[in-house]
Amino acid sequence: MATFHFDLVSPEKLAFSGEVDQVDIPGVEGDFGVLAGHAPVVAAIRPGILTVTTAGRHEKIIVLGGLAEVSEKGLTVLADVATSLDELDRAQFAETIAEMEEGLKEHEGGELDLAIERLDHYKSIQQQLSSTAMH
């Protein structure tokens, strides 16, 4: 299988850089996969789990929004936050969700809609983390 270069960058670090077979991205308009030779595109990403496939090995990384750009040079994802499952403190993640639920009382109108949408994304990630597919 042909490979391509992939960089995953967050404000804190270069989370991943290297040659990969495939990257599956949680897009705002729907999840999508990138292979070598993919058409150029820029897409917004939603909070979710990004999967990097290299030589049959899958690495899952939580991203909390950002942008993905596919070009002739490869794929670059600029993520608001990027955390590998090995680095994730699951108890802290669950606490963040609880705090978000409590904080819903402070929002109304459009702000409430956005807060609920973000909470739903976090809960979806938590559910994926609990599934057997993540092991």
Swiss-Prot record:
GO terms for biological process: proton motive force-driven ATP synthesis. Gene3D superfamilies: F0F1 ATP synthase delta/epsilon subunit, N-terminal. It comes from the Bacteria. GO terms for cellular component: plasma membrane; proton-transporting ATP synthase complex. Keywords: ATP synthesis, Cell inner membrane, Cell membrane, CF(1), Hydrogen ion transport, Ion transport, Membrane, Transport. It holds the Pfam family ATP-synt_DE_N. GO terms for molecular function: ATP binding; proton-transporting ATP synthase activity, rotational mechanism. It is found in: Cell inner membrane. It is a peripheral membrane protein. The keyword Lyase does not apply. SUPFAM superfamilies: Epsilon subunit of F1F0-ATP synthase N-terminal domain. Produces ATP from ADP in the presence of a proton gradient across the membrane. Belongs to the ATPase epsilon chain family. F-type ATPases have 2 components, CF(1) - the catalytic core - and CF(0) - the membrane proton channel. CF(1) has five subunits: alpha(3), beta(3), gamma(1), delta(1), epsilon(1). CF(0) has three main subunits: a, b and c. This is ATP synthase epsilon chain. It comes from Bradyrhizobium diazoefficiens (strain JCM 10833 / BCRC 13528 / IAM 13628 / NBRC 14792 / USDA 110).
